[in-house]
């Protein structure tokens, strides 16, 4: 069970990290646009 849990957690962490990157990209653009109006 421990080996299966480790194998199953790796893709979950990778998908979570990828999701954070996908959400962080537009978030940074919106924050910069609202704060300064210039990128």
UniProtKB/Swiss-Prot annotation:
<feature type="transmembrane region" description="Helical">
    <location>
        <begin position="10"/>
        <end position="35"/>
    </location>
</feature>
<dbReference type="Pfam" id="PF05969">
    <property type="entry name" value="PSII_Ycf12"/>
</dbReference>
<comment type="similarity">
    <text>Belongs to the Psb30/Ycf12 family.</text>
</comment>
<keyword id="KW-0812">Transmembrane</keyword>
<keyword id="KW-0472">Membrane</keyword>
<comment type="subunit">
    <text>PSII is composed of 1 copy each of membrane proteins PsbA, PsbB, PsbC, PsbD, PsbE, PsbF, PsbH, PsbI, PsbJ, PsbK, PsbL, PsbM, PsbT, PsbX, PsbY, PsbZ, Psb30/Ycf12, peripheral proteins PsbO, CyanoQ (PsbQ), PsbU, PsbV and a large number of cofactors. It forms dimeric complexes.</text>
</comment>
<dbReference type="GO" id="GO:0031676">
    <property type="term" value="C:plasma membrane-derived thylakoid membrane"/>
</dbReference>
<dbReference type="InterPro" id="IPR010284">
    <property type="entry name" value="PSII_Ycf12_core-subunit"/>
</dbReference>
<comment type="function">
    <text>A core subunit of photosystem II (PSII), probably helps stabilize the reaction center.</text>
</comment>
<keyword id="KW-0793">Thylakoid</keyword>
<dbReference type="GO" id="GO:0015979">
    <property type="term" value="P:photosynthesis"/>
</dbReference>
<keyword id="KW-1133">Transmembrane helix</keyword>
<keyword id="KW-0604">Photosystem II</keyword>
<protein>
    <recommendedName>
        <fullName>Photosystem II reaction center protein Psb30</fullName>
    </recommendedName>
</protein>
<keyword id="KW-0602">Photosynthesis</keyword>
<dbReference type="GO" id="GO:0009523">
    <property type="term" value="C:photosystem II"/>
</dbReference>
């Amino acid at each position: 069970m421990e080996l299966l849990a480790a194998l199953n957690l790796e893709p979950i962490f990778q998908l979570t990290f990828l999701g954070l990157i996908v959400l962080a990209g537009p978030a940074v653009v919106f924050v910069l646009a609202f704060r300064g109006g210039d990128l």
